[in-house]
């Protein structure tokens, strides 16, 4: 057990991850000047240990090493030890993760990097056991070796550190050239298609991540090209994930990733960002296919978020841990005996048939409910049930099992509020509200955006994190770009011009704080931020899309709807700046490539003026909101003069005969305005572009 008698400095922090280490015998510092001043004064190397509160292997290393007196003595005597919550300081995490990947060929968390007192790295790794095992060096040996090397061969350490720092500087140098062309659009699809798992959906081999932004790209590629495999790859993946154990069939919501190819055994932690992005992906897939199962999944994700990841103030938690009482997945798995005891023999046996529950289990002797191999039609026939009767029985069973599960010890909740991840959920809720015409989803999104505006924007500066009354760290490009995405989706769900105005103000601030005036692209950190050893520009789309990728898409959206060509020109500059990265690995930049698709493919600019109470206006807006038209922009107001500040090009338009009037422009040519709403709907909805 951890030493509870003498807390270290982390006891004064608000981060759930740092607080998990506040009673370690290690003399931890939070990231800051105090730690580096001590390292310089005492001429000691620095351990920067980075993780997050719901990270399984972070827990393992904490228990094996950071709660261990021998390790603590080594660290306290020979090093300065710094703990970093990667979700609060993604800038620090990003810099040193790149170093770990450079030095070891891999990355992940916990991330443990040894640096000089001037923050230059000379050794890096992820999980270290206390003593050597799993083909990994023991942490005791690593600490002994590095402290001796730092003391006795300082010149060698400094050479390694200097070379590593120089590599980072070179990697972030600006690149110029011609912009991305249509061929990049097709290469992105080809690379995604070549990695597609034709049996179980998804991309690549286990561990398999949902990667919803790849699915969003494929939906847009299908829309713009009609390539039938693109849509199949999306639906196959979404269907497989919804059937798999990665989806919680009792409490809803998706886990972070699958440890196997068929989506059966998840890494059980649930992240806000995954569920936010998957909410968007399933909603868009519903727009394209009208598959009611996708709508059902969206409803269930939102139910889960409301029940388990929402503060009373309307903001959203960050994550739920995978572990309970030291066991991964313990909260979520079942024995067959537990199922039968809860449901009784008849309903229990039926549930076990449907959800793959057996005596031997499918995960370490227990069962993860799933529908991967379920023969539903055969089960209905054998039981003499209609689809409706079966569904009602299974819903009854689910509710009973959820009630039983809630009596178990609940996983640790990381309840900090992150601006960037909250913005992703706001965008997902707003899109769901728009497509499903569901006001309560919009209400949830509005509650969360109000919280951000009231608590996480200080003197006009967007901040990173709120927890327990404390706001911390100046926002990064992700915070601004994701929040811009949220505002634009809120606007499209409500056509409230105030959201468009807020989006424009936020964009101006984003450009002022992050834009590289010399070479183009957005830096990860603001011009007013703490200086690290390198100032990065990130464009790779990992589990979460990069700030530059999201910014490029939103610049085009905002530029198109407001007529501000300078925003479109900035996106074009980004096509040039990031071209070498994207051409080297197109599928790794699938969200960024959405912006290229939008920019190069045919699109319409739609302007609608009319009274908010006019049934004709309501009709055309509802039809446009439900349709999947990813390239088009829609500007809506009651009167043209309302647009004079935000979209001045439309201020001189007029309303014809007091009726709702629709203006449609396409490929730099505008049609005559019309008040024939049925005709306008046909024109706008029937075409692919």
From Swiss-Prot:
<comment type="similarity">
    <text>To C.elegans B0495.5.</text>
</comment>
<dbReference type="Pfam" id="PF03190">
    <property type="entry name" value="Thioredox_DsbH"/>
</dbReference>
<dbReference type="InterPro" id="IPR008928">
    <property type="entry name" value="6-hairpin_glycosidase_sf"/>
</dbReference>
<dbReference type="InterPro" id="IPR012341">
    <property type="entry name" value="6hp_glycosidase-like_sf"/>
</dbReference>
<dbReference type="InterPro" id="IPR024705">
    <property type="entry name" value="Ssp411"/>
</dbReference>
<dbReference type="InterPro" id="IPR004879">
    <property type="entry name" value="Ssp411-like_TRX"/>
</dbReference>
<dbReference type="GO" id="GO:0005975">
    <property type="term" value="P:carbohydrate metabolic process"/>
</dbReference>
<dbReference type="InterPro" id="IPR036249">
    <property type="entry name" value="Thioredoxin-like_sf"/>
</dbReference>
<protein>
    <recommendedName>
        <fullName>Uncharacterized protein YyaL</fullName>
    </recommendedName>
</protein>
């Amino acid at each position: 057990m951890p030493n509870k008698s003498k807390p270290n400095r982390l006891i004064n922090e608000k981060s759930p991850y740092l607080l998990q280490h506040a009673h370690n015998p290690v003399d931890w510092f939070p990231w800051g000047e105090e730690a580096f001043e001590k390292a310089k004064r005492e001429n000691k190397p620095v351990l920067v240990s980075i993780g997050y509160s719901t990270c399984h292997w972070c827990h393992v290393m904490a228990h094996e090493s950071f709660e261990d007196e021998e390790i603590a003595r080594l660290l306290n005597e020979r090093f300065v030890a710094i703990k970093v919550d990667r979700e609060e300081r993604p800038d620090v995490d990003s810099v040193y993760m790149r170093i770990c990947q450079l030095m070891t060929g891999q990355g992940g968390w916990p991330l443990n990097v040894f640096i000089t007192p001037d923050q230059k790295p000379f050794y890096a790794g992820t999980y270290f056991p206390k003593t050597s095992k799993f083909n990994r060096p023991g942490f005791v040996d690593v600490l002994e070796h590095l402290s001796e090397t730092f003391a006795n061969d300082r010149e060698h350490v400094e050479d390694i550190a200097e070379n590593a720092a120089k590599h980072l500087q070179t990697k972030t140098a600006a690149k110029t050239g011609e912009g991305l062309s249509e061929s990049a659009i097709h290469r992105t699809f080809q690379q995604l298609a070549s990695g597609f798992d034709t049996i179980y959906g998804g991309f690549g081999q286990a561990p398999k991540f949902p990667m919803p932004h790849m699915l969003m790209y494929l939906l847009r590629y299908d829309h713009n090209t009609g390539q039938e495999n693109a849509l199949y790859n999306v639906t196959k993946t979404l269907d497989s994930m919804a059937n798999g154990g990665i989806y919680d069939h009792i409490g809803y919501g998706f886990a972070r990733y699958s440890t196997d190819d068929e989506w059966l055994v998840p890494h059980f932690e649930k992240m806000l960002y995954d569920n936010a992005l998957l909410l968007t992906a399933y909603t868009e897939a519903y727009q394209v296919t009208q598959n009611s199962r996708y709508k059902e999944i969206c409803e269930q994700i939102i139910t889960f978020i409301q029940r388990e990841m929402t503060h009373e103030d309307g903001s959203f938690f960050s994550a739920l841990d995978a572990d309970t009482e030291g066991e991964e997945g313990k909260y979520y798995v079942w024995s067959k005996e537990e199922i039968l005891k809860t449901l009784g023999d008849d309903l229990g046996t039926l549930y076990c048939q449907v959800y793959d529950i057996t005596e031997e289990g499918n995960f370490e002797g227990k069962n993860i409910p799933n529908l991967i191999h379920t023969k539903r039609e055969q089960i209905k026939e054998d039981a003499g049930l209609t689809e409706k009767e079966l569904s009602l029985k299974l819903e009854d069973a689910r509710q009973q099992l959820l009630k039983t599960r809630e009596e178990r010890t609940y996983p640790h909740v990381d309840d900090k509020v992150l601006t960037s991840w909250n913005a992703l959920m706001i965008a997902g809720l707003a899109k769901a509200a728009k497509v499903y015409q569901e006001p309560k989803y919009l209400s949830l999104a509005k509650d969360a955006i109000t919280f951000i505006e009231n608590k996480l924007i200080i003197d006009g500066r967007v901040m990173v994190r709120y927890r327990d009354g404390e706001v911390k760290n100046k926002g990064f490009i992700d915070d601004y770009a994701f929040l811009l995405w949220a505002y634009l989706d809120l606007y499209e769900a409500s056509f409230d011009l105030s959201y468009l105005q807020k989006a424009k103000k936020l964009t101006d601030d984003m450009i002022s704080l992050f834009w590289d005036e010399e070479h183009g692209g957005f830096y990860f950190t603001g011009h007013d931020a703490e200086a690290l050893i390198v100032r990065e520009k990130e464009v790779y789309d990992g589990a979460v899309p990069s700030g530059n990728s999201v910014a490029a898409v939103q610049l085009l959206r905002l530029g198109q709807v407001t007529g501000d060509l300078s925003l479109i020109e900035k996106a074009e500059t980004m096509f040039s700046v990031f071209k070498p990265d994207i051409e080297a690995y197109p599928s790794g930049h699938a969200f960024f490539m959405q912006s290229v698709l939008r920019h190069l493919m045919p699109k319409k600019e739609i302007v609608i003026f009319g009274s908010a109470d006019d049934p004709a206006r309501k009709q055309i807006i509802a039809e446009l909101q439900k349709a999947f038209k990813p390239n088009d922009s829609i500007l809506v107001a009651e009167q043209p003069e309302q647009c004079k500040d935000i979209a001045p090009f439309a201020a001189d338009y007029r309303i014809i005969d007091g009726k709702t009037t629709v203006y449609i422009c396409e490929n730099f040519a505008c049609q005559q305005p019309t008040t024939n709403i049925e005709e306008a709907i046909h024109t706008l909805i029937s075409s692919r572009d």
